[in-house]
Amino acid sequence: MFVLASPDKEKGTLLELKGKGCRQMESYLLAQHRSWYDFLMDALVEGGVMKRLDLAINDMAGILDIPELTEKCNHEECVSVFRSFKSYRSGELVRSNEQDRYGMGNTLYIGSLKSEVYFCIYEKDYEQYMKYDIQIEDTKIKNRFEIRLKNERAYYAVRVKDVLLQLFNKIIGA
């Protein structure tokens, strides 16, 4: 959790929440009997500005095969309103153990990174391996699918409560 405050009231305060920070904030909100929606709406009512909002779905079973999804994009087998994609595979030049020979993970972006909406799909298990040295087979989350919303899109996703619910229902097929 990062909180950056400026003495200049016009600049306000920046709150940036990542994984553990989100869990800490969630505990705080639960203790207050508030939801993320309540918190975000309160921030907007107080004049807050949302620069980016990431909505994540964890793939615990390894359903998403990111290299295969990348191949589908390469062969124009992906049906989407987005017009572009980027795929990255990371690794090490000097491999310290046998497991590293397969690379350090794949990431697929669907949509322009400059647009207000794009998807990011990545191998979370490899990320955990690199950050915390957790063996890949021991990670609970295999992949992560994120919808990244910026500026107005982030604002309207929160402002119109049902938009988030409808979005997730479409993704999970409910």
Range-by-range predicted roles:
Residues 1-174:
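Structured, helix-rich domain cores that form ligand/interaction pockets
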